C-alpha cells in the first residue's frame, strides 16, 4: 500500500541533485513523515518542530535523523543547505514574519539550492479558510492558532525576490480525514 500524501516521491531526483552532500533541512517536521521518506532515499535529515511530542515521535520514526525542538523562526541549527523542506509550516505568522522567514531560508540555501514548500490554499475550506475570526487578509484564528491561507498571487509575492519558481501548483492532498487544498511550490535560489 502506498503511503498517504506521498508528495515527495516525484521530487526525490531533484532533492538528490541539489542536496550537495549536505543534510536536507526540514522546517516543521512534525512526527517525521517526510523525514522518513528522505532518510529512506539515503539523505541525512535535520528537522525542527515546535512540538516536543512531535519531535519525540520523529526521533522514534527516523532514528538516523537529527531533530531539534524549536520555533522555526529561531536561528537554524544548520549553517548551509542544498535543500529545505517546509510542508505546511510557513503559514502561522504575520506577513512580515513570513517574508523574513522566506528570506532566511533563501540565505541558508546554496546558490543552486531549492525549497520544496506547501502552503494552505484559500480554497482549503475543510481546514479553516472560511468561517473563523479574521486577523488580516487571508489570515484567521483557527482553533486557537493563527493560520494564513494563500492564493497564487500571494504565493508568488512571498517568493518574488531572488527566487525562481520551478513549479507552482494548487493540489488537493490526501493527508487528513478530509481533502486538503494546498499550494505546492518548488523554488530555486536565484541571486
Residue map of PLM features:
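A short glycine-rich, Lys/Arg-flanked "PGG" loop and its adjoining helix->strand segment in the class I
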Residues: 99-111
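Short catalytic micro-motifs in class I SAM-dependent methyltransferases
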Residues: 88-92
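Short, conserved catalytic or interaction motifs in soluble domains
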Residues: 95
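Class I (Rossmann-like) S-adenosyl-L-methionine-dependent methyltransferase catalytic domain
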Residues: 1-25, 30-77, 100, 114-191
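A conserved beta-strand element that flanks and buttresses the S-adenosyl-L-methionine
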Residues: 85
Amino acid at each position: 500500500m502506498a503511503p498517504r500524501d506521498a508528495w515527495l516521491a516525484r521530487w526525490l531526483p531533484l532533492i538528490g541533485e541539489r542536496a550537495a552532500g549536505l543534510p536536507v533541512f526540514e522546517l516543521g517536521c512534525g512526527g517525521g513523515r517526510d523525514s522518513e521518506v528522505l532518510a529512506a532515499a539515503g539523505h541525512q535529515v535535520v528537522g525542527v518542530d515546535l512540538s516536543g511530542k512531535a519531535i519525540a515521535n520523529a526521533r522514534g520514526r527516523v532514528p538516523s535523523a537529527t531533530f531539534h525542538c524549536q520555533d522555526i523562526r529561531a536561528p537554524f541549527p544548520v549553517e548551509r543547505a542544498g535543500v529545505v523542506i517546509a510542508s505546511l509550516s510557513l503559514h502561522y505568522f504575520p506577513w512580515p514574519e513570513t517574508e523574513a522567514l522566506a528570506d532566511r531560508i533563501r540565505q541558508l540555501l546554496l546558490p543552486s539550492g531549492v525549497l520544496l514548500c506547501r502552503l494552505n490554499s484559500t480554497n482549503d475550506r475543510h481546514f479553516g479558510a472560511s468561517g473563523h475570526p479574521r486577523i488580516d487578509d487571508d489570515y484567521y484564528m483557527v482553533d486557537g492558532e493563527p493560520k494564513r491561507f494563500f492564493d497564487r498571487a500571494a504565493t508568488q509575492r512571498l517568493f518574488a525576490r531572488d527566487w525562481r519558481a520551478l513549479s507552482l501548483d494548487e493540489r488537493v492532498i490526501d493527508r487528513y480525514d478530509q481533502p486538503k487544498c494546498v499550494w505546492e511550490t518548488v523554488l530555486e535560489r536565484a541571486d
